[in-house]
């Protein structure tokens, strides 16, 4: 199927509560525009250099999500336009995002990344680290970031029960943070989990945002 057909197919099967992030990393602008023309507005990139190059050449109403591991010294290159940064796993990174948001007179949405998988290669916080971050005076002083939810990546495995358990754990973390730290904040709503291979399981476990690349655009170039 074409990119357009894939977008329409995904949109038809997703619950209204679930947002689709079309992961356009490594893909040329003409394929991004094919998805855009099919109604897609949220796109995800995982390399600062690629995102900074694409953004000026594509429609201004695209909501760009940065979904990769973000180095602090590169935040400034996307701070002017990025809508949401998915993989935030340290106070130092949050402080830099806030600094660059102030410089650009805007607020940037951030998702706290939790380590829910077995692989050590995955980044992310555990619950204790997240709570220490949120309790800190340094965090409370940040005025130009909006913590809009959590994200995580499950173990790459065929064991569906394990994947479901990991997604369920992330939903539990979200609920605990919501009730303890964000009960008065209506913007804390997102659970970003699920990719091309496991998004159906993620939706069953409460995902509000799935990140889909190969099932829309085909295999990586």
Where are these regions (language model features)?
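Conserved alpha/beta-domain cores
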Residues: 1-197, 203-205
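Gly/Pro- and small hydrophobic-enriched strand-loop and loop-to-helix capping segments
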Residues: 86, 207-221
């Amino acid at each position: 199927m074409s990119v357009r057909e894939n977008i329409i197919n995904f949109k038809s099967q997703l619950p209204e509560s679930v947002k689709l992030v079309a992961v356009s990393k490594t893909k040329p602008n003409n394929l991004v525009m094919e998805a855009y023309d099919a109604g897609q507005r949220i796109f995800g990139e995982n390399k600062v250099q690629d995102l900074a190059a694409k953004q000026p050449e594509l429609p201004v109403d695209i909501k760009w999500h940065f979904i990769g591991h973000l180095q602090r010294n590169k935040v400034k290159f996307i701070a002017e336009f990025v809508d949401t940064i998915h993989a935030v796993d340290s106070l130092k990174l949050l402080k830099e995002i806030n600094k660059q948001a102030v410089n650009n007179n805007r607020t940037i949405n951030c998702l706290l990344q939790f380590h829910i998988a077995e692989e050590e290669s995955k980044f992310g916080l555990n619950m204790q680290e997240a709570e220490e971050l949120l309790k800190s005076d340094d965090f409370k002083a940040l005025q130009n970031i909006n913590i809009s939810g959590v994200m995580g990546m499950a173990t790459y495995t065929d064991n569906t029960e394990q994947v479901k358990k990991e997604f369920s754990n992330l939903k539990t973390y979200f609920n605990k943070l919501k009730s303890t730290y964000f009960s008065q904040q209506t913007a804390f709503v997102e659970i970003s989990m699920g990719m091309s291979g496991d998004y159906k399981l993620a939706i069953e476990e409460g995902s509000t945002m799935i990140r889909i690349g190969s099932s829309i655009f085909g295999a990586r170039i």
